[in-house]
Amino acid sequence: MQGLMQDAPLTINHIFDRAEKYHGHKEIITSTGTGLERTTYAEFAGRTRQLAGVLDTLGISADGRVATFAWNTARHLELYFAAPCTGRVLHTLNIRLFPEQLTYIVNHADDEVIFVDRSILALLAPLLPTFANLKHLVLMDDGKGDIPEDLAGHTLLNYEDLLAAEEPIDFPAIADERQAASMCYTSGTTGNPKGVVYSHRSTFMHTMAAMMVDSLAACESDVILPVVPMFHANAWGLAHAAVATGASLIMPGADLSGPALANLIVEQRVTVAAGVPTIWMAVLPELKGRDTSSLRSIPCGGSAVPRSLSEAYREQTGLPILQAWGMTETSPIASVCHLDVDQRLLSVDEQADLRTQVGRISFGIEARVVEPGSATPVTWDGEQSGELQCRGQWIA
């Protein structure tokens, strides 16, 4: 006997449609270095539909790779949805990779177009002759940076001009939820970077996981500051989760200095701010004596959070850092260190010790530690080590 529940593809289009329908008045704010640019979800939706038309006009293949070389901005968010919602594949390029690695992944992914921020175009320009199949180069003018003279024969198209020439279009239906939606390359292995391809289904499921209370708990009332780059494991899922819930988004742009981020947290009343430990080391002294009462969560990953750093935040802001763990291959949320009801009864020092751990494996994921080179689990006693294996709805 089968159930009677309906079955519909789990696609990123649904995330976009919900934001457009229910949260059009909510804001996406981008820091430009000289001020703030504000747009609403309604405006974002219209521009994203125009961008879909741009991809058609440029002749990008039905499942073509659309690359970005960009900071966290509203424009980057438009690309996050225009590419997969039209059946194409978003490929976020890590701006901090070595030149030879960038050449490898652009060619390996077969990128047809790269959308690049003006402020970092100079990093990309010398590599253009090495990109074998690149058809188009689109400039997103963030107001700074010289335009190199030598672009290897590419005409530099202007993002805003392209959008202005298009009308908003309807997205095609994505019939197969397992269709590729985006891809990131991880350099955390031996040899060349490895490509991780996320599906519509996996992204949808990971977005739901990010909304769970025992995970990142993203919700409509949040004001989310993703300091973690959008080219790093999908900004830890916060870009999709914010759009899915209608949370306000604060995009930091190129200036990730302690003073700039502290100002955004305080002035925009940020509730969730996510970044790596080095970011929070720089931000902490800039928050001293300021009103941080809006903050409810500081997710942190990428490397182990020092106990001293988490405790410094707890003592100064009343809020310890929330350690999480994951990889590009896990989309990336795999565990979040929330203390359970019994652990919250422990002493302050004991709780601080526990917060140095990565927490419990997230709902939807199975994990085990096995003996190296085998499938034999090690004894679960807190002492044995081995190789970690994960599987689940958003695990590559």
Question: What is each of the regions a protein language model found here?
Answer:
Residues I15, T57-L58, C85-A164:
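Structural core segment of the AMP-binding/adenylate-forming
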Residues I298, V305-A324, T328-A396:
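Conserved AMP-binding/adenylate-forming
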Residues M1-L58, A62, T86, N133, ...:
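N-lobe entry segment of adenylate-forming
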Residues L55-I60, E166-Q179, M183-L225, G237, ...:
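Conserved adenylate-forming
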Residues M1-L10, A125, G145-A180:
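Flexible, low-complexity linker/hinge segments
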